[in-house]
Regions:
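Thiol-based oxidoreductase modules, predominantly thioredoxin-like and allied folds used
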Residues: 1-2, 24, 38, 45-72
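Extracytoplasmic/secreted cell-surface and envelope-processing proteins
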Residues: 29-32, 65-66, 98-101
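Conserved redox-active cysteine motifs that mediate thiol-disulfide chemistry
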Residues: 24-40
Length: 132
């Protein structure tokens, strides 16, 4: 998982993969923790992610330390994507021009009941649009 969005965009462009931006409150958000446990930390998800996306974790912890740079980056991205609740997962392509990064959104989701297969079915729907 990347925490630096600029680095993730560069990798995504190089590998021709969209970003999966995971907006989470890792140390306080119950649904975020469930999504991690039930989907994001499973072998099925790991295999799928390696083939399809570049993973970016944008964390908004209450107790855990974050550098000022990461905190600022995450706040800007939360605003840019209009995230109002956690967990939120955005699929997007990032394009950097003249030092500025713009995102082309492919879709968003959050917690989906039913484990990895149910969650990945939703994710694959967004990625299928990318190929059109």
């Amino acid at each position: 998982w990347f925490t630096d969005v600029k680095e993730a965009v560069a990798i995504g462009n190089k590998e021709k993969k969209p970003l999966m931006l995971f907006f989470t409150g890792s140390d306080w958000c119950g649904w975020c923790i469930r999504l991690q446990k039930e989907v994001l930390k499973t072998p099925e998800f790991a295999k799928w992610a390696k083939e399809n996306v570049v993973l970016v974790e944008l964390d908004y912890p209450r107790k855990q330390y974050q550098s000022e740079e990461i905190r600022r980056q995450n706040a800007e991205l939360q605003q840019a994507f209009g995230v109002q609740g956690y967990p939120t997962v955005f699929f997007a392509k990032g394009v950097t021009k003249n030092g500025k990064t713009n995102f082309e959104g492919l879709g968003s989701t959050g917690y989906v009941a039913g484990g990895p297969s149910a969650w990945l079915a939703v994710a694959n729907g967004f990625l299928a649009q990318k190929k059109k």
